[in-house]
Amino acid sequence: MRILIAYASFEGQSEKIASRIAGALEHCGATPLLINTREQPEASFPPECDGLVAGGPLHREQHPLELAQWLTAHHAEWAQLPVAFFSVSLSAASHRQQDQDDAQHVMQQFLDDIGMQPAISVTFAGALKYSRYGFLKKRIMRNIVKKSGGKDLDMSMDYEYTDWGEVEEFAGRFAALVASQP
């Protein structure tokens, strides 16, 4: 069974998650195919796919335009397939329920906008990658963390919040769903 993973990534965490999903799908007997829609916006939808996993980061209450454009352009190819979607954000790592609810709401709005009704959708906690930010973004991100009560304020370090067990469980659930299709 061939499963396409179409994703977008800015600082690399969504790409890392997509790669982990690919590994978990392989472990389940699937053949994963990866397309980074930011780097390959003209990539075609591979033939004979049995399912689609799509996802990307949530930045400034939006998912990447390149991901939306690619999914919209290939709607006919994935519309009849089992689909799963993942959203990556720092809000998903928040201890505040309102932040988590907001991340869910923005993800659902994105899905509604592109006409996607995935069988499985999740928000994964992302990462705070100070080492990849410029001068201004480092300070903005630090202030956001500080205002939300976070403690990860040392800008000389990166902080990863992704629950890799949750990522692998998501991939396993989707592989089982695709395998159960006639």
Q: PLM features: residue spans?
A:
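N-terminal beta1-alpha1 ligand-phosphate binding loop
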Residues: 2-30
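A structural signal for isolated positions on well-ordered beta-strands in alpha/beta enzyme cores
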Residues: 2-4, 33, 84, 120
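Conserved beta-strand termini and adjacent loop/short-helix elements that scaffold enzyme active sites
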Residues: 6, 35-37, 124-126
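Short, glycine/serine-rich, charged loops/turns that create anion-binding
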Residues: 10-11, 39, 90, 128
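FMN-binding flavodoxin-like domain, especially the glycine-rich phosphate-binding loop
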Residues: 16, 28, 47, 51-52, ...
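A short beta-strand-loop structural module common to alpha/beta enzyme folds
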Residues: 28-41
